[in-house]
Each structure stands twice: as structure tokens, then as C-alpha cells.
Amino acid sequence: METLVSSIFWTLTPWNNMLLLKHGRIEILDQNTMDRWYELPKQEFLNGEQPIQIFTTERYWILFRIGPERRGKARMPTDVYYLIHPTR
């Protein structure tokens, strides 16, 4: 069983915010104004170009690193951009 190596939790109002992951950084944007109000260097929780798995709930964004073994089984690309628009 693979363990999740790292996770990050944000307490947000998910329907008013958007999480944008780019190479090198993560941004959380206010969808109403499109103002960036938080940025985190990707290297703080990722090694190289590992993609991450994102879960949203009404109160939290939850980001988990996906290890190489699990990525291989799922045939996930390593060079990806994720754009999440959570719903109510």
C-alpha cells in the first residue's frame, strides 16, 4: 500500500476560488475578480514534475502528491496543467 507523502490543506470558500497549478508554482485565484491572492512554489511539496491529485470539499482544498508507482499504474502524464473549478 502506497502512503501519501505530502498534503496541503487550505480553508477556502471553494465556489469563489479557483486553484491553478502551473510548472513552478501554484496559484489560488478569486473567480469573481481573478485576483491572485496566494502563490506557493511547487518545489515546496513536489519533487520534479510529479503531478498531484486534488480533492475538494465544501471547506477544504486537499492536495496529495501521487508517487511514481501509482502514476505508472494509472498511465498518468507527467507534463500536465491542472485547472480546478469546484462546484457548490
UniProtKB/Swiss-Prot annotation:
Keywords, sorted A to Z: Chloroplast, Plastid
GO cellular component: chloroplast
Subcellular location: Plastid, Chloroplast
InterPro entries, alphabetized: Uncharacterised_Ycf15 (IPR019645)
Superkingdom classification of source: Eukaryota
Chief subcellular location: plastid
Family: Belongs to the ycf15 family.
The protein, known as: Putative uncharacterized protein ycf15
Species of origin: Piper cenocladum (Ant piper)
Protein's gene: ycf15-A
